[in-house]
C-alpha cells in the first residue's frame, strides 16, 4: 500500500511539472509574438524621412556621384558631413528599427534611380550600419 501511494504521489508530481512546463512554453510564445508586433508598431510610428534625413541625403549624393563618374566609383566614400550626420542619426534610432527605416529610404530613392544605380544604392543602405560601426552590421532587405 505504501508503495502504491508513493507511485501515485510521484505520478502526480510529474503531471504538475509537465503542466507547468507546457504553460510556460505557451506564455513565452505569446510574449515573443507580442514583442514583435510592438516593435513593428513602434517602427511604423517613426518617420524614416524625418529621423534619417542625413542618410537619405548621403544615399542621394552617392547616387549622383555614380552618375557623374559614369561607372568609376568608390562605393564606400565617406567624405562630407552627411555621412557623419547619418551615423549620428542611425545611432539615435532604436536598433530594431534601423533596417526598416533604411529600407524605406533606400526603396524610395531606388524608385527615382535607374538600373545599376538603384541596386548600388540598396547595397550601400544595407551596409550603412556596418560603415557606422553599429548593430546590426548588415540589413537584409
Curated annotation (Swiss-Prot):
Residues 23-35 form a propeptide. It is found in: Vacuole, Aleurone grain; Vacuole. InterPro entries: Bifun_inhib/LTP/seed_sf, Bifunc_inhib/LTP/seed_store, Napin/2SS/CON. Gene3D superfamilies: Plant lipid-transfer and hydrophobic proteins. The keyword Cytoplasm does not apply. Belongs to the 2S seed storage albumins family. PANTHER family: 2S SEED STORAGE PROTEIN 1-RELATED (PTHR35496:SF20). The mature protein consists of a small and a large chain linked by 2 disulfide bonds. This is 2S seed storage albumin protein.
